[in-house]
Regions:
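Acidic-and-aromatic substrate-binding clefts and catalytic sites of carbohydrate-active enzymes
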Residues: 138, 194-197, 315-319, 344-348
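N-terminal capping/small domains of soluble enzymes
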Residues: 17-153
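Short acidic/histidine-rich active-site segments
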Residues: 337-344
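Active-site clefts of carbohydrate-active enzymes
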Residues: 303-316
Length: 370
C-alpha cells in the first residue's frame, strides 16, 4: 500500500487543528469536563493497545491476512474527509429508512427521502464515508461513488412484520456492493437473539467474500434479548456483554466494529448466564465511562479491529451528547464515531455543524488517549 507523503499528512493534520477546530469541547462537557478530559486509565494501559493513527494500515493491518486490496480500501477511508490523515473515522449512517421506517426517520426533514441529499450531507460535513442501504446508494452511485467512499449495509430488520422479530435479513449481496464501487460493506448481528447463530454464519461468509473482493468489513455488533433487561436495568449496553459481542465480531472478520457506548457493567452477573471472571470487574474495568469503553476496545483484539461507537437517537442535547461520546471513544482508544439520527433529523446546516463538532474532538490534540 502506498502511503500519502508524510508532509501531506502532517499538513492536513496541522491545518485541521489550527484552522478548523472551532468547538469548545470543555465548555460543552460542562461539569464533566475535568473528569472526562483528565481521567487516567489504570485498568488496561494505553501502551498495550493498537491505537488509531495515520499509519494504522502499515503499523497494524499489515500483520493480518487481508488481501492488499482490503488494505487499499481501508487507506481510502482513512484518507477522506476532514479527518484524513489522522487515523480516525467520521461516518454518516442512514439506514434508518428500513430499520425504523422511512416516515419515522425522514418526516422531520423530507429532503432525505431523496438519496442524493443523504450523500450530499456526508460530503458537505467532511465525513470519511457514507453508509446506507443498497437501494439508497445504488440509486446515486454513478454520480457519487467516486466522490466519497460508500459503505453498503447488507442486512436489515423490517418493521412491518408483527410481532417484532429480533432478526436481520439479507437485502443485498456483496457482489452488488462491489459492482457499485463501494469500498466497504456493513452488517448487523443481533447477538443473544434466537436467530443469532444463523446471522453469524451468514455474515461470516459475506465478510469472507467482501475481503476477496477487496472491501473493508464493518459489523454492527448489537445485543438483542429480553433477558438482558433485568430489575429495571438495560444491560444491552453493558461493557461485559457488549465486549463479548465485539470479540465475536472480530472473530468473524470485522475490520471495524460498531458498538453502542457502554453505559453500565455486570450484565453477565445480572442475567446469571454465560461466563465471566471477577477480574473483569475488579481489575479490567471501573465505573468510569472511559474505562468501560476501553474494555469494549480490548475485546476488539486490543484495537487491531477498530472500535467506533454509535451516536444514538436524536434528543434535546444532541451536540453535548455527541461530543461527550466522541471524547470517551477517543480517550478510550477508539477509532471514531458513526452518527446519523442526531444529524439528519436536523436541518442540513445544523447537521453539518454537529458532525463537524464531533470531528473537532478527534482533531483536537488536547483530547488525548487516557
Amino acid at each position: 500500500v502506498n502511503k500519502y507523503p508524510l508532509w501531506f499528512l502532517l499538513s492536513v493534520y496541522e491545518e485541521a487543528n489550527q484552522e478548523l477546530i472551532m468547538t469548545d469541547i470543555a465548555q460543552l462537557l460542562g461539569k464533566e469536563a475535568e473528569d472526562l478530559l483528565q481521567h487516567r486509565c489504570t485498568t488496561i494501559p494505553a501502551e498495550n493497545l493498537y491505537l488509531p493513527g495515520a499509519d494504522f494500515v502499515d503499523r497494524i493491518m499489515i500483520d493480518n491476512n487481508r488481501p492488499n486490496t482490503v488494505l487499499r480500501s481501508m487507506q481510502s477511508l482513512l484518507n477522506h474527509g476532514r479527518l484524513a490523515g489522522t487515523g480516525y473515522l467520521s461516518i454518516l449512517p442512514v439506514d434508518q429508512g428500513i430499520e425504523h421506517s422511512a416516515g419515522a426517520s425522514f418526516a422531520a426533514n423530507p429532503l432525505y427521502f431523496d438519496p442524493k441529499n443523504i450523500v450530499e450531507l456526508a460530503i458537505e460535513a467532511g465525513c470519511n464515508c457514507v453508509a446506507s442501504t443498497y437501494g439508497v446508494l445504488a440509486s446515486v452511485s454513478r454520480r457519487y461513488a467516486h466522490k466519497i467512499p460508500f459503505l453498503v449495509k447488507l442486512n436489515h430488520n423490517e418493521t412491518l412484520s408483527y410481532p417484532t422479530q429480533y432478526d436481520q435479513t439479507l437485502y443485498a449481496s456483496v457482489e452488488q456492493a462491489f459492482n457499485m464501487g463501494a469500498v466497504a460493506v456493513g452488517a448487523t448481528i443481533y447477538f443473544g437473539s434466537e436467530q443469532s447463530r444463523r446471522q453469524i454464519e451468514e455474515i461470516s461468509s459475506a465478510f469472507e467474500r467482501a475481503h476477496e473482493l477487496g472491501m473493508v468489513t464493518v459489523l454492527w455488533a448489537y445485543l438483542r434479548n429480553p433477558a438482558f433487561n433485568k430489575d429495571g436495568v438495560d444491560y444491552h449496553s453493558s461493557a461485559d456483554l457488549t465486549g463479548q459481542a465485539n470479540h465475536i465480531a472480530a472473530t468473524i472478520g470485522a475490520d471495524i466494529v460498531k458498538q453502542k457506548m457502554a453505559e453500565n457493567n455486570g450484565g453477565y452477573r445480572a442475567v446469571k448466564f454465560g461466563y465471566t471472571d471477577d477480574r473483569v470487574y475488579s481489575k479490567l474495568t471501573t465505573d468510569h465511562p472511559i474505562d468501560l469503553v476501553r474494555y469494549q476496545l480490548a475485546n476488539c483484539y486490543m484495537g487491531r479491529a477498530g472500535l467506533i461507537n454509535s451516536g444514538g437517537a436524536a434528543g434535546e442535547n444532541d451536540l453535548q451528547e455527541s461530543v461527550r461520546t466522541a471524547v470517551i471513544n477517543k480517550r478510550a482508544g477508539g477509532m471514531g464515531l458513526i452518527l446519523g439520527r442526531k444529524a439528519f433529523k436536523k436541518s442540513m446546516k445544523e447537521g453539518i455543524a454537529l458532525i463537524n463538532a464531533v470531528q473537532d474532538t478527534y482533531l483536537d490534540k488536547k483530547v488525548t488517549i487516557a
